[in-house]
Design a protein with these regions (language model features):
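Extracellular/periplasmic, surface-exposed regions of secreted and cell-surface proteins
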Residues: 1-60, 71-368
Length: 368
């Protein structure tokens, strides 16, 4: 039995008259391409397309809820549809050449793109005359109607060169040029370089055979790199307006979100110094010291003074952090006999995090 004011719930009526149906359709297609050019050039590329459509139909019968017919939960019908697609591609050109037996050169150029779009609509009505009339079009009153759409694009261009001399010295350099539509229009593109070098000491002529039996491998490496981070979301930097009912007798809107044209990338600079050793063909030792500093930290939903006309910023660049420390790892092959092997490993680390510059809104935010 269903109560007149919704005090009771009728599971039988829900099972027989109510429904919640979802249909999902996914499609994915990928095309790859390969071609070997003259002069040691190789081309590799792929394009991938992904599409998804989802439809949801729901009906909440009044016979199950027992509410009055003027309630929003009386014969409530909902239809919702969403469509999304993404298109990705990667194009890579490689060059690999050995000169004079000791000089090796590898160059790589990569171009990546990503684009995604999605739309969704939903409408809900209530007060349908009968549980047999479950389409929202038949509803006597609108419970809600929503629609949304978003679009995002990214592009990355990467160039890398690696030089190897006699397997003793390795030098590499990389440049990343990135663009992201979620950034402010004044800082949509950024460039981040990196470089590194390595010295295989055990391949030097002064590394005697006797010493090589004790220290089988020895390498020194160093690197310096800059990287960037963009905000999540499709278009949070856009300004937005929202309805506020009426002003006097006319419809009214107000600015609800500030435009962020000057939003910047969160940038990180990191350098690393490392050592790799292998002793007696059993013990591997890896030592690393790193120093990292992050500036223009991205903070989300930052509260600001109400005198600005806004309650918060969707994103803000403020503050900086430093992170430095030391890591050590040891791997020892206890047993290496035919198909049997036993390895024991241990590691130790010390990490120091420090807030170099406090966020500008520190006194306004509630930190716990």
């Amino acid at each position: 039995m269903s109560g007149s004011k919704g005090n009771h719930f009728n599971p039988v009526a829900m099972a027989e008259l109510g429904f919640n149906k979802t249909n999902v359709r996914d499609e994915k297609m990928t095309v790859t391409m390969e071609y070997d050019f003259p002069f040691d050039l190789r081309f590799r590329g792929w394009v991938s397309l992904y599409m998804k459509t989802q439809k949801n139909n729901k009906f909440l019968p009044q016979a199950a809820t027992g509410v009055l017919m003027n309630s929003i939960y009386a014969n409530q019908a909902t239809d919702a549809t969403s469509d999304a697609y993404s298109l990705q591609s990667e194009w890579k050109l490689l060059y690999n050449k050995v000169f004079g037996e000791k000089h090796g050169l590898t160059a790589t150029g990569v171009f990546r793109t990503y684009q995604s779009e999605s739309t969704s609509t939903s409408n809900s009505t209530y007060g349908n005359a009968s549980a047999n009339l479950s389409d929202p079009v038949i509803g006597s009153a609108v419970a809600g109607a929503n629609s949304a759409s978003n679009e995002r694009r990214t592009v990355t261009l990467t160039g890398q060169v690696v030089y190897n001399y006699d397997s003793r010295y390795v030098l590499n350099g990389t440049i990343n040029y990135e663009g992201n539509s979620s950034m402010g229009r004044n800082n949509r593109f950024a460039t981040y370089p990196s470089c590194g070098l390595a010295w295989n000491i055990d391949r030097e002529h002064f590394w005697s055979d006797g010493f090589h039996k004790v220290v089988n491998e020895a390498k020194v490496r160093a690197s310096l790199a800059w990287t960037g981070k963009s905000p999540s979301g499709a278009s949070d930097y856009y300004g937005a307006f929202q309805s506020m009912g009426t002003y006097v007798t006319n419809p009214a809107i107000y600015p609800s979100r500030m435009q962020l044209d000057k939003l910047k990338w969160e940038s990180t600079r990191e350098w690393d110094l490392g050592f790799d050793f292998r002793f007696f063909n059993r013990l591997n030792v890896t030592l690393d010291y790193y120093d990292k500093k992050t500036t223009d930290l991205l903070s989300r939903n930052v509260e600001i003074s109400s005198t600005t006309g806004y309650a918060k910023l969707s994103w803000m660049n403020s503050g900086s952090l430093s992170n430095k420390g030391f890591e050590a790892r040891f791997d020892y092959d206890v047993i290496k006999r035919g198909p049997w092997s036993l390895r024991v490993n241990a590691n130790a680390s010390r990490n120091i995090n420090k807030v170099e510059v406090l966020p500008a809104n520190y006194t306004q935010e509630k930190y716990t």
